[in-house]
Design a protein with these regions (language model features):
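Intracellular juxtamembrane helix-capping segments at the cytosolic ends
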Residues: 125-139
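Multi-pass alpha-helical transporter architecture, strongest
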Residues: 105, 185-210
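A late C-terminal transmembrane helix in Major Facilitator Superfamily
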Residues: 140-173
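Helix-to-loop junctions at the C-terminal end of transmembrane segments
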Residues: 72-85, 169
């Protein structure tokens, strides 16, 4: 029989009644959002505003970054260490990405900034491990809904982070501060919080114990 909207909503609610869902959702809202906020919203203003890049130069950086981000998920997929170590990798890589944003906040050398942006692009591939973590964290009959919820969280996170960093940049500029530094610090802080939440909130009972 066809599932009603009420039944579908109720079963999504079942996911939130599982304690380990919260860590997965929080991390999911921040990792992809951090990279996409850089690539989609702040890359051009950062390179042109802080380093004086032309539109063509900025476009070249964006093209290379997009190509990197296109292929690195396959590499991380092949390197997937399995359910137990995967969570450690997710915690470590999300903290490392936060550290790179922190470094970007204070970096004033154009070539070093471009290299750092490309390193961020290479590291962004770890996000594919989050999908594998979702599959390992729920029983088979709930996997589809869990993946849907995770994907929704990712795109809600993108919208929220771009909105928040836009507000913060406007506030910083109004008060005479460097808007790009404020944005990078904000993203670094959010990644650190998300990684910490993922590390310490309950984990799925389906995963092997350490």
């Amino acid at each position: 029989p066809t599932e009603s909207w009420a039944q579908a909503a109720s079963r999504f609610g079942d996911l939130f009644r599982m304690p380990h869902t919260w860590g997965i959702v929080i991390l999911g809202m921040c990792c992809y959002a951090a990279f996409l906020s850089l690539r989609g919203l702040w890359l051009g203003p950062l390179l042109m505003g802080r380093f004086g890049f032309s539109l063509v130069q900025t476009g070249n950086v964006a093209l290379v970054l997009s190509l990197i981000a296109l292929f690195v998920p396959a590499l991380f997929g092949r390197l997937d260490p399995g359910p137990l170590r995967r969570r450690r990798w997710l915690t470590t890589f999300s903290l490392l990405m936060g550290a790179l944003f922190l470094l970007m906040a204070f970096l004033n050398h154009a070539v070093a900034a471009v290299v750092l942006i490309f390193v961020m692009g290479m590291l962004s591939g770890f996000g594919v491990l989050q999908y594998a973590d979702v599959r390992s964290s729920y029983p088979a009959e709930m996997t589809g809904r869990a993946l849907s919820l995770f994907t929704m969280a990712m795109f809600m996170g993108v919208a929220a982070m771009q909105w928040l960093t836009g507000l913060l940049a406007a506030w910083a500029q109004y008060h005479g501060h460097d808007p790009f530094r404020a944005v990078m610090l904000c993203i670094a802080f959010m990644l650190t919080l998300a990684s910490t939440a993922f590390r310490w909130l309950p984990r799925s009972p389906l995963l092997p114990q350490a």
